[in-house]
């Protein structure tokens, strides 16, 4: 949609105001994981109980508040939309940007998908992952392919974090390698830059004031997720059987666009689609006119729900 979202200093970390469609609802919930940790969860429900359902997984340092406007748009297009904050991010439980075991994230996503599947038993379930979330949905789909009855009707990888364009400094790289292998919780400043994330000045203002934005991650997190988990994503991509839509912004200077195309070509999905968007930055949820992307995502989901 073409958006007129503006920075609102009173709504920290919120890009857009969540709204419920006619006959639907918007709620903020807390989802309890098997180990007792609670995930902050935003839920947009469509008027039709059998509408397709989308689980939207954010990227590194982000949180669900960045996707309010996009979720509003997808909900208005006839989808139920669930957007969690990952463990250790945003308003969810967990040490900030820290883990000693990358496997906690696939486990969390699996538990969440199980819960959504129980709630939306008459709905087709899809998962969209932005950046780091693209890794998470790939693992989820690879695991799902081994099930007798898969949960996912399809996945969408949006500017997936397959390979960086800008890397950590040499000193921080050594810190991640040696500290990460020891499970160090020492925080490492990741090379975030609002100017590379988005060209939207209103979104840049929101980001610069966002106290929920995780601008640092621990050496252990970057080792476990950024190196170990991400290092296996191509192998997991080969195991994906579900239909897949891969989207890449042509203005993205955060992740490697050739690596995204290689990821697409590696996917084991027989039904796969690759789409690019001229001028779209890495954090395309902040585009001033995101209508082409939102329409394509909704149309693809509806087509695969028939």
Task: Describe the predicted segments one by one.
Residues 61-64, 90-124:
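Catalytic nucleophile-loop/oxyanion-hole region of alpha/beta-hydrolase
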Residues 240, 246-248, 252:
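Short beta-strand/loop motif that positions the catalytic acidic residue
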Residues 51-59:
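Short beta-strand element of the alpha/beta-hydrolase
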Residues 273-306:
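Catalytic active-site module of serine/aspartate enzymes centered on a nucleophile-bearing elbow/loop
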Residues 1-33, 37-46:
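An N-terminal hydrophobic leader/cap segment in hydrolases
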Residues 131-218:
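Alpha/beta-hydrolase-fold enzymes
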Residues 242, 256-265:
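Short alpha-helix in the alpha/beta-hydrolase fold that links the catalytic acid
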Residues 71-95:
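Conserved alpha/beta-hydrolase
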